[in-house]
From Swiss-Prot:
Keywords, sorted A to Z: Cytoplasm, GTP-binding, Ligase, Magnesium, Metal-binding, Nucleotide-binding, Purine biosynthesis
Name of the protein this chain belongs to: Adenylosuccinate synthetase
Gene: purA
GO molecular function annotation: adenylosuccinate synthase activity; GTP binding; magnesium ion binding
Record: residues binding GTP: 12-18, 40-42, 305, 331-333, 413-415
Length: 427
């Protein structure tokens, strides 16, 4: 039995969808343990492209159990839109293939509305929310006023909790100048969701535990990236959940001793969507070249991603915090054609060089990246299928990542398709 965590090692958009899909081939269970439909990833199978936001990547296989854990916040409307989208593409989403935690929190219409109103009120200090209601849903969870999936399954309980929330939230919405919500309309809408959701709902911690006892392989699929973690990310420009490996324990009801490994997905350069610090960001033609070559536009928002050189300080931090057993390096094919390639190996801060990521945004703003320069390679590597086929300079680049982070590279991705994957060693 193996229980592996797959998580983003940067600010998200590292290629987790492709790699989770690839690794899911040998998994029996694929579990989402945090986040919501604010995440987006693309999986390419043959000539078909699937854009997923909430449903685990294992859904593309016929024989996998896919789990939305209690750490996920679920927008029923978004969930069923995604299920309809998948079924239109010929992917069956049955109650045997998809399991939804009865303890997961629901995203309600007032969460989405308040997300937008609060972001607008922040003005120039906005934090770049996707507007999906994720943050407000986690806020309600923390203050114990949230509505869970199990509440939705009991009409009278749901009615009472919804009425209280509508009363409270309408006061807030009025304060922000928004339009009040109608209880009856939402109650009717969500009761319809309850009927459709009921077959999928269960205690997912029991499902996962039972599968592990049968020596089944479990893959825990993270959303966003480690630098968006609520505690270890660039706060407040973060998401509202735990995106590091520790989030699996609370977000899926799994004990830490059950986890056998953690794999960090790292892009061969660095990108970020929205506001927040980004020490190696390139605001010149080089950054634009990376964006266009790498097609760096968000799956969920369509926003252009900010691009920059690879930051090894970030990867070293992620490896330490999540106890990574290996890295998967993606999109190294994008770097083909660059004469010189830089990587950040430290920050100049207050007259000295540091190799850690400061907690304070004010301190981080003072940090200037210290670069090491490498020779690039001209040849396209999209057709490479073994480590030996990679250009020598690409191998030197990858070796630097391993040495600096003290973490081996297990897989190198040279394109978006399943077969554009080079296995270097054991995960």
């Amino acid at each position: 039995m193996s229980a592996f965590v797959v998580l983003g090692a940067q600010w998200g958009d590292e290629g987790k969808g492709k790699m989770t899909d690839y690794l899911a081939e040998t998994a029996d269970v694929v579990v989402r343990f945090q986040g919501g439909n604010n995440a987006g990833h693309t999986v390419v199978v043959g000539d078909k492209e699937y854009k997923l936001h909430l449903v685990p990547s294992g859904i593309l296989y016929e024989d996998k159990i896919n789990v939305l854990g209690n750490g996920v916040v679920i927008d029923p409307k978004a969930l069923f839109e995604e299920i309809n989208y998948l079924e239109d593409l010929g992917v069956k989403v049955t109650k045997e293939k998809l399991k939804v935690s009865d303890r997961a929190q629901l995203i309600m219409p007032y969460h989405r509305i308040l997300d937008g109103l609060k972001e607008k009120a922040r003005g120039k200090n906005d934090i770049g929310t996707t507007g999906k209601g994720i943050g407000p849903a986690y806020t309600d969870k923390a203050e114990r006023s949230g509505i869970r999936v199990c509440d939705l399954m009991h009409k009278d309980v749901f009615e009472e909790k919804l009425r209280q929330n509508i009363n409270d939230k309408n006061e807030l919405i009025r304060l922000y100048g928004g339009e009040e919500l109608d209880f009856d309309k939402i109650f009717e809408e969500y009761n319809a969701y309850a009927d459709r959701m009921r077959p999928y709902v269960t205690d997912i911690s029991v499902i996962i535990y039972d599968e592990m006892k049968k020596n089944k392989n479990v893959l825990f699929e993270g959303a966003q990236g480690s630098l968006l973690d609520i505690d270890y990310g660039t706060y407040p420009y973060v998401t509202s959940s735990s995106t590091v490996a520790g989030g699996v324990c609370t977000g899926a009801g799994v004990g830490p001793t059950a986890i056998t490994g953690a794999v960090g997905i790292a892009k061969a350069y660095t990108t970020r969507v929205g506001k927040g610090p980004f020490p190696t960001e390139l605001l010149d033609e080089m950054g634009e070249k990376l964006r266009e070559k790498g097609h760096e536009y968000g799956v969920t928002t369509g926003r252009a991603r900010r691009c920059g050189w690879l930051d090894l300080v970030i990867l070293k931090s992620t490896a330490r915090i999540s106890g990574l057993t290996s890295f998967v390096v993606t999109k190294i094919d994008t770097l083909a054609g660059f004469d010189k390639i830089k990587v950040c190996t430290g920050y100049e801060f207050d007259g000295k060089v540091i190799d850690y990521f400061p907690a304070s945004l004010e301190d981080l703003a003072k940090c200037k990246p210290v670069y090491e320069e490498f020779d690039g390679w001209d040849d396209s590597i999209a057709d490479a299928r073994s480590y030996e086929e990679l250009p020598e300079n690409a191998k030197i680049y990858l070796k630097k990542i391993e040495e600096f982070t003290d973490t081996k590279i297990s897989i190198v991705s040279v394109g978006p398709k399943r077969d554009q994957t080079i296995v270097v060693g054991e995960i």
